Amino acid sequence: MQNVHCIVMTRNDDLIIEHWVKKHINVFDKISVVDGSDGDFTQKVCEKYGILYTKDPEPTPEKPFHEQYLREAAFNLLKPYLTPGDWVGCFMPDEWVYHDPREIVDMVPGAFHDVIAWNQLNILPHPSEKEEYFKSIEEGTYNPTEVFKHFWHRDNNKTCCEPRMFRYLGDEIWTHQIPWCDNPVAGRIQPLNRDNIAKIKPTYFHYKVFDLDPTKYKDDGFGHFDK
């Protein structure tokens, strides 16, 4: 079985980050977190579970602040533990794998394919879950992945596939172009030199709204209970 690691980009995800770690710590061989949170909750979770951790790097004129720069920071923490041929996943705390990535990478034929795109299923609050949500909040047992179970889609596009895993070869290139508005690849998930996507399409759940504070999500949050 091939080694599979994960880099996680997070910011103020206190309600879900420890749940994510508990779920995935035995799924990935090594996990590296880049954190832009205001407090130290995520840092303490990473220390508790032995997760590699770094704060968001400070942007510079040569390396501006965007997703490629952040993922590169987490990737650099992983490099001492990587062997050519390993796979690296790119997820966030509200993205939970349904299929086991260790089994998925073994299904990729040969060495030509260096990217695996994952099928995203969005999960949002449903009126039928309102009572359970309030109960879990009151009891201090809230876990969004146990409360919310309804898939959601927009404009008849029920799902989408995104390149969420790449094969480590040691020659990874991340963009440092500036500024964001002139950088068409700043939001790209995988390194610039990884484009050969395998045909297999595993699935992950995207708990798109796990914090129902209406000041944060408005209609995409608490409002779902009224729809």
Per-region residue spans from a language model:
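Short beta-strand/loop segment that forms part of the nucleotide-sugar
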Residues: 29-38, 54-57
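Catalytic-site signature of metal-activated, phosphate-bearing donor transferases
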Residues: 64-72, 76, 82, 98-227
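The conserved acidic donor/metal-binding loop of glycosyltransferases
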Residues: 92-96
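A short acidic, amphipathic alpha-helical/loop segment
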Residues: 19-23, 44-45, 103-107
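Active-site beta-to-alpha loop of glycosyltransferases that engages the nucleotide-sugar donor
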Residues: 2-22, 37
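Short, acidic, metal-binding catalytic loop of nucleotide-sugar glycosyltransferases
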Residues: 22-30
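Active-site-proximal specificity loops/subdomain of glycosyltransferases
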Residues: 42-91
